[in-house]
Amino acid sequence: MSVRPDIATRPVHPATRGAVRRPTGLVAALNDPARASAIGLVLIGLAIALVVLKPWLPEALVRWPAALVVPFADALNRLFLFVKDDLGFLAVTRAGASGIEWLLDITANLLYGKRRWPNLEPIPWSAVAATAACLGWWLGGWRLALLGGGTFVWVALMGQWKWTMETMSVIVVAVPLAVGLGLALGVASWKSRRVERVLSPMLNIAQSLPHFAYMIPVVVFIGVGPKSGAIVTIIFAVPPMIRMTLLGLRQVPPEIVESGEMCGATRWQLLRHVRVPTARREILVGVNQVIMQSLAMVVLASFIGMPGLGQKLLQLLQSLKIGRSIEIGITIVLLAIMLDRLSKAWAQRQPAHFSRGTSWFARHRLLVIWALLMVGLYLLAQVVPLLAEISRKHAFSVSKPLDAVMDAFLTVVDPVTLAIRSFLIRDVLIPMRDAYLWLPTGAVLTLVAGVAWRVGGWRSALTCTGFVGSIALSGWWDRAMITAYMVSFAVLLASLVGLPLGVWAARDEGRANRVLLACDTMQTFPSFIYLIPVIMLFGVNDVAAIAAVVVFGLVPMTRYTIEGLRGVPPQLLEAADMSGATRRQTLWNVSLPMAVPTIMIGLNQTVMFSLFMVIIAAFIGTQDLGQEMQRALSSTDVGKGLVLGLCVAFMGLTVDHLIGRWGAERSRLLGLTS
């Protein structure tokens, strides 16, 4: 690129040397906060006017004309067909899937005796339980040992061993592959800004897409079954690993790196022996997220033929066998809690150090005990078959007592739940849905542009209007508005419960810790689990779907409210006390205003959780984007599924952008950030 000589040699005035160049002209006018606020108010007023004047508006402003709908789905289908058939990508994906299938055959053979290579006898359930107990003891003492071993004892006694091992055989393969891929991409993003710029928007969209959007392309390129479940699990679980790896490497103190350089370490040695070990905590948090995401997706992958606990739970829910469903649900919850606690303990565990001369046995005592247990239990299982496998006829079951208890409970609460359901459907949900569908498309777009302009200027307005406008262009506006009404009502209820609950819990340290522990536990549950109680209470309708969304979205609202209030600087609270403020005055005038940025992050997370859950809740009879996504999955319509998934992602990204910009500005005004 050439430079004009007169510009290159022109002297720079000393007063302007080093000064930051600021935008001038139209850009400066658009970025002016006062003017941006005024423009935003004008656009919001225009949106209200469009709503009032709807009967006189041209049809194009009321609904995007069908003739102008862009056939994104057809274009994507043609692209996928071209990639699959003309470029021969199908053969490549099937070849790659065969390698994963080979790994799955090994784990399936070892865990539940599937007749595949290496054709060995399955590991006895007692040996698996002992392994989990030893691992728990090594990571966190007797409590984790009891949790690990007890979980697998429960699974065996309930006769659910094969279904559980079908699920675990996929997790055992998917988690290491997702961790390795995420670690490699995270390191690549850290080393290259160009790679990070490419990956960052992809990760934003990937983490906003609902679960089902991942499944359809995998079914087209891979097929159905365990290998598809493993691949979709890997794809779904990789993004948090990339982000946590990047975060950890960026937070490595420079003085540690300088120490390595002074010792003559090469760039690879610095990465391998200095940076990655220093970022160990963040990387292991990423591993924890991969494990939990994998369990959530493996359960949902039953929709594409993945055998295991998810498939069994799906069958039982479809036949409304509540007692058996609760048994399977308890198993999934125990697995989730066990995997979460073990992986968190691993992330927090510090390497053990021994004095010079310590014997090998003393350093590896638990490993020796585990090996002896494995050999002993394997030999004992040859003599006592019940230690190898507990068949269904020898298994315990609490499904009949549970059914009896549930029947008695529902007999008592049915009049109440029926009244609640009838009131909500007749007086709240149907009018609210009709109101959302009545809104003109032009008014909604103008309102989004006005709010975004007021919050973040013209760039935010352009971004958010582009997101929402893409939904209108896709032709799925009405379904998106139904999704929006369900999510907004669920978020409102979750906020009305979660915010006061968080405020109440934050007033006492012990109470806050107990509520946060409950939030941690609930957050480990795969989202599918929340459908069991709501189907039991409300049946199959919008009320049940919204109830599941509310419970699922309650956790982040409560958690971030507590964290926000606990994060208020103590000197501010002391100043309020010295001024004679009561506890209520301190809460309303000091604590809550300072906690608002953190609470808004909780609101943002509640919206994202609700969007994910409302798509899953389509299984119990909604008429939103989730229902269409399930239809696309059943017909393997890749284009339609991706377009619907992007519509959901754009809704989430719009809310995320607005809340993020507002929260950042609020933090700046409060002096929390520069």
State where each predicted segment sits.
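Transmembrane-helix boundary motif in ABC transporter permease subunits
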Residues: 132-139, 148-165, 174-203, 448-458, ...
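Individual transmembrane alpha-helix segments
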Residues: 88-135, 419-451
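Interfacial/capping segments of alpha-helical transmembrane domains
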Residues: 54-102, 384-424
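Generic hydrophobic transmembrane alpha-helix motif, especially the helices
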Residues: 170-173, 177-184, 190, 203-237, ...
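C-terminal transmembrane helix and the adjacent membrane-cytosol boundary/short C-terminal tail
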Residues: 250, 281, 285, 326-384, ...
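Glycine-rich helix-loop "coupling/hinge" segments at transmembrane-helix boundaries
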Residues: 220, 249, 292-335, 351, ...
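Transmembrane alpha-helices
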Residues: 175, 231, 235, 267-300, ...
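Short cytoplasmic-facing helical segments at TM-TM junctions of multi-pass membrane proteins
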Residues: 241-287, 557-605, 629
